[in-house]
Amino acid sequence: MSWLYALETLRHAAPWLASIFSIITYLGGEAVFFAVGLFLLWCVDKREGFYVLSVSFIGTVVNQTVKILCRVPRPWVRDPNFTIWEGARAEATGYSFPSGHSQNAVGVFGAITLWNRKKRAVLIVFPILAVLVLFSRMFLGVHTPADVFVGAGTALLLIFFVYPVFSRDRGQRTLVSWVSFLLALSLGYLLFVLLYPFPADTDPANLADAQKNAWSLVGSVSGMLAFALIEPRFINYKTEAPLLAQIVKLLGGLALALGLKEGLKPLLSLLFGAALFPNAIRYFIVVIAAGLLWPLTFPYLSKIGAKKARTEHDEQSPSPTEGTRKDDQ
């Protein structure tokens, strides 16, 4: 705790730093992982998107399992005299060890770095972002160094473990088999948190949080399996498009996905009350909408900006008569 107390002193002396790191820490949150995964799937490379999402999904199962087994309380619970940055409290749910934000940041940014390791800018920028997220979790007081480094180390192992699956195009059958494995893993985790006889001192709120995450994972991966079965054969959308079209694809798709993710909450609560299983329904619908329905618009959206791009290309290309004159000269 001495390291955290030193950071607490610095935080009190320079609250503006805490404001900056409270923004940086969101880079390790679910929303950023969600947006980055969809951006890669829609606009960059479907294999890279599945790679990053797979690292994150397996990481979540491992992270949540270790959390609920170890049941390490947060720093301010272990030491009531310790204070945290209050703006970070709302996101600091569940047990402390290991850090989910740290694992997400290293998993997402590390996987992108390994995939694009020949690009110098990526090799510099993304590792720096990951390190900043790790430091932010400690600076804000919501995690200890052990929480952060174990979460980051787990993500690093998964980055290299999953990479061979997607390092080359292995076809639809391999993709379906891989996502089926992810679904089995998610179902195993769900059964564990529902049926395991946890000790009496297990915090009910933290256990409920683990069960909610398990249902969400099952719904998400079920949607991914539907994507793997249907998209390559019946949709097979192209990620390439003019820049303006890519922006519309990304912003429109995120609005749809996030709108469904948040909009379905009150409806499902009205239908099922406080039950946790509707989280599986909600995330399944979101993934189906994002992976199978929204891409149906891509052939039409790809026309946005295409005319301008062709015009600019034609203006830069020499006319046939100009080419003839140059040849004659």
Where are these regions (language model features)?
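Residue-level signal for the membrane-embedded core of alpha-helical transmembrane segments
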Residues: 28-31, 53, 57, 103-107, ...
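N-terminal transmembrane-helix/juxtamembrane module of multi-pass inner/ER membrane proteins
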Residues: 1-32, 63-94, 205, 215, ...
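Short charge-dense sequence patches
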Residues: 4-7, 11-15, 56-63, 100-111
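Membrane helical hairpin/interfacial module
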Residues: 44-76
